[in-house]
């Protein structure tokens, strides 16, 4: 996708408007993302002047403009993930863009803000600056505590799953300390196939207890 193409951005806006006509969430928050691959940025002469984060924000701004043609209250996320974890340098978010932070490349046996984890240090390095840039209003953390597809290497059969409750609790507290009050996560490879394979349900209830503040219940 060449974000230096005005025509391409207009097509994105038009398609976003079509989607908004079909789908209007009660929260007015939309989570339309770029392709879920690393290093997918255009490298034409004009796009070379942009960081991956700047290029992504141009797309999300275009999506928001299209959404608001049908839903004037629409909000659209900026997904900080892989190449777009850094703060945009030259492009500003239009009103209605909010931060969605997804720290995928991390250690799950350590808290996200554990300074002893090199992976986690890299994932959180830009988070305070991202929150300063986008603001904390509507900011959301999208984590991977229940993503057994990730823990299984995206291969089936799924591996046995064990929830790192201590990590989860520390992560939630860290997000709250930064002003992020919306927390969610992927939950994959934990359905019927998992139950048939292992004869027990994964500890999704433990996740709910931590988020509700009833971890000891």
Predicted feature descriptions by range:
Residues 1-216:
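Catalytic-core regions of glycoside hydrolase
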């Amino acid at each position: 996708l060449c974000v230096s193409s005005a025509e391409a951005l207009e097509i994105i806006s038009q398609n976003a408007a079509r989607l908004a006509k079909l789908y209007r969430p009660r929260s007015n928050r939309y989570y339309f993302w770029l392709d879920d691959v690393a290093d997918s940025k255009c490298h034409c002469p004009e796009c070379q002047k942009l960081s991956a984060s700047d290029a992504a924000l141009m797309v999300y701004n275009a999506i928001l403009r299209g959404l608001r043609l049908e839903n004037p209250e629409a909000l659209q996320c900026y997904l900080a993930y892989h190449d777009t974890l850094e703060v945009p340098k030259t492009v500003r978010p239009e009103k209605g863009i909010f931060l969605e932070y997804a720290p995928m490349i991390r250690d799950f046996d350590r808290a996200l803000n554990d300074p002893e984890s090199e992976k986690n240090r890299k994932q959180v390095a830009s988070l305070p600056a991202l929150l300063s840039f986008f603001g904390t209003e509507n900011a959301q953390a999208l984590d991977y505590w229940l993503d057994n597809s990730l823990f299984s290497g995206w291969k089936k059969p799924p591996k046995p799953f064990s929830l790192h409750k201590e990590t989860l609790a520390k992560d939630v507290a860290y997000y709250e300390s930064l002003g992020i009050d919306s927390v969610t996560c992927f939950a994959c490879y934990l359905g019927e196939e998992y139950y048939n394979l292992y004869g027990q349900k994964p500890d999704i209830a433990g996740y709910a207890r931590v988020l509700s503040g009833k971890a000891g219940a």
